[in-house]
Amino acid sequence: MTSCVAEEPIKKIAIFGGTHGNELTGVFLVTHWLKNGAEVHRAGLEVKPFITNPRAVEKCTRYIDCDLNRVFDLENLSKEMSEDLPYEVRRAQEINHLFGPKNSDDAYDVVFDLHNTTSNMGCTLILEDSRNDFLIQMFHYIKTCMAPLPCSVYLIEHPSLKYATTRSIAKYPVGIEVGPQPHGVLRADILDQMRRMLKHALDFIQRFNEGKEFPPCAIDVYKIMEKVDYPRNESGDVAAVIHPNLQDQDWKPLHPGDPVFVSLDGKVIPLGGDCTVYPVFVNEAAYYEKKEAFAKTTKLTLNAKSIRSTLH
């Protein structure tokens, strides 16, 4: 008999929009739900929509002083509060106070953090822990409900790449990333896709709380391997751009020798190494400053045990 994991019922959920102030789908949806939350209301659940970086939203910029989605590490969260701290670090401490504290029993059960990308990634769920049966089950449910529209899972578990995301204060952190959409722009198709992903996620939680047992499942995920910078000249400036064959080909297999970059004089730079990879965040606008042209991932399968709520 397959073992069933009994999990505590979910009680508190937050929906974050505006972690990056120019990614407008989450801003638009959360602002709407703050005025009328009927769409995200679920019986027996506390669901709190929240604008995480209001100053950046007001200016329609990614951030004010630094990236809010990279400062939720214990070092920043424990710094003594002062006006000298970057705005986003102060804001992170406020958010941690409201929805955390991180790694504590009082923290919110689930945080959905809504993002857009300029890359052609479609519907993407971001997973931080490959051993989390509850989230693998949730993602399987969302993927099944979204079909035939693809919904990819990006696993950012890595020994040296530490993200310290806004959502990481929750017991179950969920990144929802939908693109392509230019920053500072709203697209109806992207809006609809994100809305549907969140609906299915909330439905899953409600069914789980009501006692439904979810049988064992498996999902394909794309696990981060490394980030690839643009070729640069001696001054540190970008010396080549994403090759047309790679542009908009997120999640597609990229083989050694395939063209990756092309310079102004027509020089083609191929993929090195000896293994096939799957690129994501290809030519993401916000990652130029992070010196990231794309991320290499490897494709693998994650399995989850059967789960049910301890109340049933």
UniProtKB/Swiss-Prot annotation:
Entry function: Catalyzes the deacetylation of N-acetylaspartic acid (NAA) to produce acetate and L-aspartate. NAA occurs in high concentration in brain and its hydrolysis NAA plays a significant part in the maintenance of intact white matter. In other tissues it acts as a scavenger of NAA from body fluids.
GO biological process entries: acetate metabolic process; aspartate metabolic process; central nervous system myelination; positive regulation of oligodendrocyte differentiation
Protein name as catalogued: Aspartoacylase
SUPFAM superfamilies associated with the record: Zn-dependent exopeptidases
Predominant subcellular localization, coarse grouping: cytoplasm
Signal sequence extent: none
Record field: catalytic activity: an N-acyl-L-aspartate + H2O = a carboxylate + L-aspartate; N-acetyl-L-aspartate + H2O = L-aspartate + acetate
Annotated positions binding Zn(2+): 20, 23, 115
Protein origin, superkingdom: Eukaryota
The entry's keywords: Cytoplasm, Hydrolase, Metal-binding, Nucleus, Zinc
UniProt family annotation: Belongs to the AspA/AstE family. Aspartoacylase subfamily.
